[in-house]
């Protein structure tokens, strides 16, 4: 059996609305997501493009679902994910990223991220597995302390076992 998705879950000491903003608004993403930001505000059913501070395309796709969290209902942000920041990855088919943002009580928000549809994208599979851990923890740190984790290179994100 081959694995086709990465699944992550974290708890953040912030409101679901704050977490939602951090996921969907460029003034937030640029601070914790490797300086990447949406070119235009994301809209359900519309294409999107993210770029780095240098203006180079990072990721593009379609926003499939954009349902902000409300009292008693989790938020969902679902996007297709076509990597553009690496020419080798750009040749692979688009995958799918699903964010779920839910009030967990006690001032906490549960964030679940599933990066799936990776069965035809082995390079993307490998590339994003450690990257999402860093991004999620940097978002958590930013929301809880006001400062993201320090910027690092992809090699610095890899676990020691993956560097060999």
What are these regions (language model features)?
Residues 16-17, 64-75, 100-110:
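A short, structured loop/turn motif at beta-sheet edges
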Residues 19-20, 29, 48, 63, ...:
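Hydrophobic pocket/interface hotspot
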Residues 7-8, 18, 24-62, 71-74, ...:
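Short beta-edge strand/loop motif at the mouth of beta-sheet-based domains
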Residues 84-133, 152:
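Beta-strand/loop substructures that line and gate deep hydrophobic ligand-binding cavities in soluble
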Residues 8-10, 60-65, 95-103:
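Hydrophobic/aromatic beta-strand elements that line small-molecule binding cavities or substrate pockets
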Residues 47-53, 78-84, 115:
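Short beta-strand segments that buttress and anchor functional surface loops
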Residues 1-16:
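Terminal, regulation- and interaction-focused segments at domain boundaries
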Residues 141-164:
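Short, highly charged C-terminal tails/helix-capping segments
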């Amino acid at each position: 059996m081959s694995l086709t998705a990465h699944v992550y879950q974290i708890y953040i000491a912030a409101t679901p609305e704050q977490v939602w903003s951090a996921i969907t608004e460029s003034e937030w993403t640029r601070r914790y997501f490797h300086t990447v930001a949406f070119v235009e505000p994301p809209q359900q059913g519309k294409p999107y493009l993210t770029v780095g501070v240098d203006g180079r395309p990072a990721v593009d796709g379609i926003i499939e679902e954009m349902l902000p969290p409300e009292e008693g209902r989790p938020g969902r942000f679902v996007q297709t994910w076509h990597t553009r920041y690496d020419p080798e990855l750009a040749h692979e088919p688009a995958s799918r990223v699903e964010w779920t943002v839910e009030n967990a009580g006690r001032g906490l928000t549960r964030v679940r991220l599933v990066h799936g549809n990776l069965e035809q994208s082995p390079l993307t599979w490998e590339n994003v597995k450690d990257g999402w851990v860093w991004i999620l923890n940097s978002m958590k740190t930013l929301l809880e302390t006001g400062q993201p984790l320090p910027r690092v290179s992809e090699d610095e994100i890899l676990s020691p076992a993956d560097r060999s």
